[in-house]
């Protein structure tokens, strides 16, 4: 493991300019962490976040190390409870194991009911970004503030049928909006074409409100739609099956990132 430079107070920068620490124990000054994280969120580079839901669960450490060594920017982790969506994915022990070995940003997407009950738990597990579903929150603004109070960036996910206009009053409090481009619950689904229009609408809302919110796309992302998603306003592309089912996942990540930033 590379030792952090004293100049960066515990931050190790990857080739993709990831500012998050390899060992969270090195983090002594939260104000520096927050400032660096904010700089990262305002970067113009488009980001790739492999979805661990599509990884080989029987050889998970191998796939985590592959992402660590790749040009990926974030680890995207889908947490499902079998209630909000029909599938069940990761429990806390698995998430703890992932964050222990991951050396990149931990982007957690909660597809669960009553997400407020678990905000502190996910913060303690090392999550950098915590995204909750608009459809699962009874008081969205309060949930966002609770996430930020734990030192995480606050994201809001919306299902394919949810109207962008519902974020009008909270967009300035949201660090990231995740647009589901498939119906949530299972990996490997086909891409919903109306996603392009939703990204355009969301980008227009962000600009009109003067917000700095990132747009993340989750579901069915491949080399066939990545470029157009970026062109209409996306900042972060989540790719699961396209990466992990390929013959060379690391090369697939590299090519996807190059395509997104070309």
Model-predicted segments: where are they?
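Short, Lys/Arg-enriched N-terminal segments with co-localized hydrophobic residues
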Residues: 26-42
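Glycine-rich phosphate-binding active-site loops on the catalytic face of alpha/beta enzymes
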Residues: 136, 181-188, 233-252
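Conserved N-terminal beta1-alpha1 strand-loop-helix module at the mouth
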Residues: 37-131, 137-139, 154, 167-174, ...
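Short secondary-structure boundary segments
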Residues: 79, 110, 134, 158-160, ...
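Acidic, divalent-metal-coordinating active-site segment for phosphoryl/phosphodiester hydrolysis
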Residues: 220-232
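Short helix-capping segments at alpha-helix termini
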Residues: 71, 101-104, 149-151, 206-212, ...
């Amino acid at each position: 493991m590379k030792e952090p430079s004293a100049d960066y107070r515990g931050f190790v920068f990857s080739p993709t300019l990831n500012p998050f620490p390899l060992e969270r124990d090195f983090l002594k000054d939260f104000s520096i962490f927050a400032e660096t994280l904010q700089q990262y969120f305002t970067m113009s580079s488009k980001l790739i976040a492999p979805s661990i839901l599509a990884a080989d669960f029987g050889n998970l450490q191998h796939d985590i190390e592959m992402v660590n060594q790749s040009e990926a920017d974030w680890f995207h982790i889908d947490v499902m409870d079998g209630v909000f969506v029909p599938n069940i994915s990761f429990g806390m022990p698995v998430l703890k194991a992932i964050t222990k070995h991951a050396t990149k940003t931990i982007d957690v997407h909660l597809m669960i009911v009553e997400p407020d009950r678990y905000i502190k738990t996910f913060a303690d597990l090392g999550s950098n970004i915590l995204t909750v579903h608009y459809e699962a929150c009874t008081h969205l603004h309060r949930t966002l503030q609770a996430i930020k109070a734990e030192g995480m960036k606050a994201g809001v996910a919306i299902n394919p049928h949810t109207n962008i206009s519902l974020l009008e009053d909270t967009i300035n409090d949201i660090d990231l909006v995740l647009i589901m481009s498939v119906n949530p619950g299972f990996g490997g689904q086909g891409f919903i074409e109306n996603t392009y229009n939703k990204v355009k609408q969301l980008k227009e809302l962000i600009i009109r409100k003067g917000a700095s919110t990132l747009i993340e796309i989750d579901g069915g992302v491949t080399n066939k739609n990545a470029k157009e998603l970026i062109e209409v306003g996306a900042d972060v592309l989540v790719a699961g099956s396209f990466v992990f089912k390929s013959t060379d996942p690391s090369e697939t990540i590299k090519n996807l990132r190059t395509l997104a930033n070309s």
